[in-house]
Structures are given as C-alpha cells and as structure tokens.
Design a protein with these regions (language model features):
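GIY-YIG nuclease catalytic motif and its immediate N-terminal context
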Residues: 1-197
Length: 199
C-alpha cells in the first residue's frame, strides 16, 4: 500500500504537498527532537521551500530508509528568521541564517493524527533528499499497534518499575516508540532496588 492511498478522499492536491524526513543521525535534529523542538526546527526553511505548497507531511528517520509519521501541517505565511527569538537551547543547522531563512507558519491538522509514531513508510534510496514532492509515492512498511498503557512522555520522566521495563524490553514491536526515543540520544539509566535503595 502507498502512503498517499491512506489520504484518498481527503481532496488533497498532491502537487501542492511536500514530504519531509528528519534524520535522527544528524546531531542538530536529534538535539532538537530531544528538546521537543522538532516542529519549530522544521518551520525554518529557505524562502522558496514551502512557498508553492499547501501542506507539509512530516516523518522521522529512525533507522535505514524508514520514515515514522509525525503529522500533516497546513502551510500559512512566513516571517523572517531571527535567531534571538528562538529558545536559547535550540540548535540551528548550518543552512539556517537570518539572510536566507524564514519561519513558516505550519498548523498541525488532525489528518492521520492517530497514526503519529505508528505509521512507518519506506522513504526510498534518496534519503539525502529530505524534502520531496507529495507525488513521490511512499510504500507503507507497517502500522504499529496503538499502545497507551505505557506512554513515553519526556526524557526527564523515564521512571519505570522493573515489571514495566521488562514488558517494554521483551515486547519491542509493541513498544517501538520507546526503543526509538531512548536510542536517539546518549544517556545513562540508573536501576534502583526500591526495597534496599541500592543502585
């Protein structure tokens, strides 16, 4: 099945859609993703990137040529990129300059909202090209099961019981989101015996 087929009947003009893939192997992307700035990061582009499109569909590259669906965004206007108006710990890439970049208004829609972090596509061999036309067909690799009982909230809130940790480790397919997010950053995790307090 092609990704575009999932949005059949939604009256989308694919000629005016851009597909983007953020590769977590890039340090600045991993850093912004960890800090919750992925949407902010993708809003900063060169003047022409999203000028002639109505929608941007975002994916996260976590391994190989895959793309994990993040959301569909309507494209609004743009304003100048001014670094000092961004969070201090935001990490711009080398192409983001105040002379060449703008900040696009990207409004997240509810299209496929229930598929965030679950729908996985094959981006194809052209992974170096992070932005492609919406008419470029993408094969759906998998739709992961929805798991709500153990949801990942943020990196500074990873506090799991041994039973929960065991469930995640031995059910990787169901808890793929945990594997992706924890492997995206370097970290040391402390295991503590709740009875003795020993680490």
């Amino acid at each position: 099945m092609k990704f575009q087929e999932l949005l059949a009947g939604k009256q989308i003009n694919w000629d005016r859609v851009k597909l983007i893939r953020h590769n977590l192997t890039k340090e600045e992307i991993a850093a912004n993703y960890e800090r919750g700035y992925l949407e902010l990061y993708q809003s900063v582009q060169n003047h022409a990137r999203f000028r002639d499109c109505d929608m941007v569909i975002s994916f996260l590259g976590t391994e190989g040529t895959n793309g994990v669906f993040q959301g569909c965004y309507c494209v609004g206007g743009s304003k100048p990129y001014i670094r000092t108006k961004f969070p201090e710990d935001f990490v711009p890439d080398s192409g983001m300059t105040e002379e060449k970049s703008v900040v696009y208004e990207l409004v997240k829609t509810d299209l496929l909202a229930d598929m965030k972090d679950r729908l996985v596509i094959d981006w194809g061999k052209g992974t170096i090209n992070f932005c492609q036309n919406g008419t470029t067909e993408k094969e759906v690799l998998e739709i992961r099961p929805a798991v709500s009982e153990i949801s990942f909230t943020s990196y500074d809130r990873v506090l799991l019981s041994f039973e929960t940790l065991h469930k995640i480790v031995y059910n990787k397919a169901a808890y793929k989101e945990w594997e992706e997010k924890l492997s995206a950053v370097a970290g040391v995790y402390l295991i503590t015996d709740t009875k003795t307090g020993k680490h």
